[in-house]
Amino acid sequence: MVGMEWDTGARGLTGRPLPWSMVEGILSGREVGTPRPVLHEAEPECLSTPRPGPGSTEVPGERRGSRQGERSGEIPFVELHATSSYNFLAGASDPGEMVDRAHELGLSALALVDRDGLYGAVRFAEAAAEVGLATVFGAELSLREGVLTVLCRGVEGYRRLSHLITGAAMSAGEKGSVDYPLLPQVAEQGAGHWVVLAGVEWQKKIDHLIECFGRDNVVLEFPARMLPEDTDHHDILRSIQTRTGLRGILSTMPTAATRDHVRLAGAKCALALRANLAEAESSLHPMGGTWLRSGGALARAYPQCGDLLATTVEIASGCAFTFDLVAPELPRWDTPDGHTEMTWLTHLVESRFDRRYRSRPAEVRERARAQIRHELGVIEQLGFPGYFLIVDDLVQFCHNATILCQGRGSAANSAVCFVLGITNAEPITAGLLFERFLSRDRDGPPDIDIDIESGRREEVIQYVYTRYGRDNAAQVANVITYRTKGALRDAARALGYPQGTVDAWSRGASEPPADVVELAGQLKGQPRHLGIHSGGMVICDRPIADVVPTEWARMEGRSVVQWDKDDCAAAGLVKFDLLGLGMLEALHHMMDLVAHHRGITVNLWELDLADAGVYDMLCRADAVGVFQVESRAQMSTLPRLKPRTFFDLVVEVALIRPGPIQGGSVHPYLRRRSGEEAVTYDHPVLEKSLGKTLGIPLFQEQIMQIAVDAAGFTGGEADALRRAMGSKRSPTRMAALRSRFYQGLADTHGIIGDTADKLWNKMVAFAAYGFPESHSQSFATLVYFSAWFKHHYPAEFCAGLLRAQPMGFYSPQSLIADARRHGVEILPISINESGVQADAPDGHLRLGLDLVKGLGEEAARRIAEHAPYTSIPDLSRRADLGVAHIEALARAGALDCLGVGRREALWQAGIAATERPGMLPGISAIEAPALPGMSAFELMATSIAATGVTHDAQPMALLRAHLDALGVVPADRLLTDVADGTRVRIAGVVTHRQRPQTASGVTFLGLEDETGLMNVMVSPGLWDRQRVLARTAKTLIIRGIVQNATGAVNVVADKLEPLPVGEWLSRGSRDFR
């Protein structure tokens, strides 16, 4: 009805309801009506002479006539209780969006608070610095007495809050929990450096708050959430204010930057409550949440709240500070008497030089010594000797503990790292540029990644905690964000759809409805929870909590900072990357197996890198299980590249990467390699830098070398050019470097005009996709080592890979099938012969008990320890196994060695499991009935279900007669017996489904039969037509065109068919007789 007033509860402090038209405008975000004057009994001091707190900066716009105030004409206001998406499963907008919106609204400052953390602090600070918005930092603390919002007064307040949160998280003993002390102890830690916001929920404890924190540090928080209960809360808080004299502020407590995001905020809150939106309705805001409002909007909605608005600015002026914390330094190294860190590092390098270079030519040794002198000078000038000593200590710990490790990445460009034993790529003969790793012109510490065998990485991590202390060392976080499937699942869950339907959508069996798609799109990319970085650790000379809180990680014994690697770098925390690498673990197992069974000691770093047999094998794309070159794309490239030297492997590692593929380097290089295209250079000066890659740029270091050779750049200048050309290009820096490059070309070689333009444009284009040669060098060593074992010791190679699972591109079933194709006899799982893991006795492959699903490591260990066994009751009693254990072993065929069939073994399991230690043996025996044996297919199906593998045959072997009748061609004939361009039918077990971003929508299917692997290309159109079959089938018959002219085989599919396994293997059914 026209003119009717609707009691929204938005009556401010007058008790008079606002008209619905104004409420509608406020809720929609429209500015309605003329701003009403804000009445003050006296001019608030904060609007004229702000009083900065410790470490604070003046709040922009807090004075009358400031630029922001003039621009917007708004009432000065600061939102002091905002929540971003880094308050996991609560806020809907990221810190940057919150900052941008606050700036647009004319707010003079903003406070972002996370629950029991400072997760978004760095991103908040960086976003605010870009727009000149003052920042207030704080957190919501889950105290025993209730949730309390704390704002920091300057840097010291921040440091104290970080320590409080750290103590609460670490004392709780597990991830996701906090255990704060009682309120008086909390206040004691703040020591007057915090402002606490008390809402109506603190009304009965307000005197206790004042007693603990002091009257000047307690502020009443009046809600402005446009809820009916707001008015009642205002009345209560005004009464408390009258009695106590406390200051008050107004806050919308926003969980989103704008109204557009509040539905997402509501959905996330429902998920946090483990409910859907309907179930959580009583706990959620009717709109889903609240959003940032301007001072003017709040003044219109709450016309007599002027004192509350003014107080927000006053408090911000005493709390805001710029986030330029002084980060802790690295621990000082305990050097022997008479040594500094630098002299001790020099001593270590000199003492280990001969070990690394004794066998090198004299000319290389002299160049290496000169390079090392240069590198040590740079390290000393930049003040990083302690960094290298810490890394060296970690590597020496690994060596002493016989843990395989090696440094990789840009550290491989350093001769110092090579001599110390940190890296294994020799940079002098490889021509690697040290400045790619470290230079006088670069800010920040070097970055050394250490790959450690994955099964023993935890030992190294715990060594760091022990050596440097839990307070001074922690892992770097990884913010886990929603990806497509996770977003779809949680969106559907929030909207109340049943789990079975959600599972079908996730599998792609059907399309989700529009509301799910829309909400999932909003969730995608949003932070969900805090995880652990793959290997980053920060190590400091004082508590990390001075800068960022730490908390327990999910994994036992791990603690983690609340920031990711980028946040840590921005705050000046030095990160060390300790990365787990499955291939190093597999190689260690291979070495141990060869030593144990053959009595041969293999020293990886002494292997001959020119073994012709290894390269012959790789030229055939016989690379299943070989590090980095076993993927579909790599195996398709190997026959075209035809690697014959170690550097060819370096190229192979770098070639099949998204960058070179998108940059168009792959095919030109391969054509030049095969002689189909002449090797040319845009200018003769490029031959030095591009000669080893046939005139095609592949490596980042080549950009630097071109700048050095063609334009006379120093190494440091060349690295600055490389970084400037990276993903975050600065137009200003690019312009300056372009001018320097052109001048250098002219001065050094007289290159001008079109040739200069061509060189510059090629470098700019290449910079976006170049791969570090140092990285390729490090990985190429592991390519060779793993290929060497595959060629010389295939049984030990496969056993090592199985022991290191999960890792690599292929499943254990595919690895075992590949070993079988290489002549290795596969021995089944046996309680009397198998160990916990795979073994390689006498050149055979014995499968391990760890493959048995549902058995568990402890039970497997007991079985192996007490073997052999004479019967199932004997096994049950001595290995202390239950019914489920014996049933799992029976299905896996591990009891076949006792002379009982699998069905009989399953029958005996329940009875035998009553034989426990301390009981008389044999009294529980019951005769099993006569049970039929299993067919070959039933045995295979049972083995796959129980272990995921088959020891005696690949599944397609049982179907070969049927496949031959259909004209299906085996994998091993596609290269030798089928002409390029022939239409064929193939069939196999689906091993992979891939859709690389570089493939223009083409999906690649991996198929395997008993003779080998096949690569199938499915066009977007065919995929769409047969989507359900393509996505869900475990076996397929595929019709398509063979492509094998280059020596690598692909099949371009034009039809997918289900493989009728059940029909072919059925014994017939008895229907309705």
From Swiss-Prot:
It catalyses: DNA(n) + a 2'-deoxyribonucleoside 5'-triphosphate = DNA(n+1) + diphosphate. Disulfide bonds: none annotated. The keyword DNA repair applies. Its main location: cytoplasm. Its EC number is 2.7.7.7. The keyword DNA repair applies. It is found in: Cytoplasm. GO terms for cellular component: cytoplasm. One of its GO terms (molecular function) is 3'-5' exonuclease activity. Belongs to the DNA polymerase type-C family. DnaE2 subfamily. CDD domains: DnaE_OBF (cd04485), PHP_PolIIIA (cd07431). It comes from Corynebacterium efficiens (strain DSM 44549 / YS-314 / AJ 12310 / JCM 11189 / NBRC 100395). One of its GO terms (biological process) is DNA repair. Residues 41-73 are annotated as: Disordered. Residues 60-73 have a biased composition (Basic and acidic residues). Keywords: Cytoplasm, DNA damage, DNA repair, DNA replication, DNA-directed DNA polymerase, Nucleotidyltransferase, Transferase. PANTHER family: DNA POLYMERASE III SUBUNIT ALPHA, ERROR-PRONE DNA POLYMERASE. DNA polymerase involved in damage-induced mutagenesis and translesion synthesis (TLS). It is not the major replicative DNA polymerase. This is Error-prone DNA polymerase.
